[in-house]
UniProtKB/Swiss-Prot annotation:
Top EC group: translocase
Protein name stated in the entry: NADH-quinone oxidoreductase subunit B
SUPFAM superfamilies membership: HydA/Nqo6-like
Membrane topology annotation: Peripheral membrane protein
Name of the coding gene: nuoB
Length: 166
């Protein structure tokens, strides 16, 4: 009699887990379609981010229109431009203040590898040296279309969590 009770409790738990797995897909869909990026820029690539926010590219059709001025309300950081050693702790502090789950896009040659300034004494050789970068968008500066493609790749990674490796 005790064995049957344990089996029935296990069946109830299995049923709940299957339901939660289905909810995970819904949550990942919602996260991928409602990213809230942090508004801050480091250099010339930030100008391209501003250009991408205009009506010509219409990022709002993908749900990417809510730019947050506070890191506590944002879940996406776009590191766009040269990161100096003096700016590195501030960027890291902004990242630490962001809400979970949080994602990082490195946009431009300077954010990815230091760009043409990599041999300078004050330039950090890439955002991935101190931040977990999810998507890299190469270029100097990348076009707004490249930013849109990178955002869609991040959306794909969020909606398929097996792709995300940290």
């Amino acid at each position: 009699m005790e064995i049957k009770t344990i089996q029935s409790e296990e069946e109830k738990l299995i049923g709940k887990n299957v339901f939660l797995t289905t909810l995970d897909a819904v949550f990942n869909w919602a996260r991928g379609n409602s990213l809230w990026p942090l508004t801050f820029g480091l250099a010339c690539c930030a100008i391209e981010v501003m250009a991408a926010g205009g009506p010509k590219y219409d990022f709002s059709r993908f749900g990417y229109e809510v730019w947050r001025p506070s890191p506590r309300h944002a879940d996406l950081m776009i590191v766009a431009g040269t990161i100096t050693k003096k700016m590195q702790p501030l960027v890291l502090r902004l990242y630490e203040q962001m809400a979970e789950p949080k994602y990082v896009i490195a946009m431009g040659s300077c954010a990815i590898s230091g760009g043409p300034f990599v041999d300078s004494y004050h330039v950090v050789p890439g955002a991935n040296t101190f931040l977990p970068v999810d998507v890299y968008i190469p270029g100097c500066p990348p076009r707004p279309e490249a930013l849109l493609y990178g955002w869609l790749e991040l959306k794909r990674k969020i909606q398929n969590p097996r792709v995300v490796k940290r």
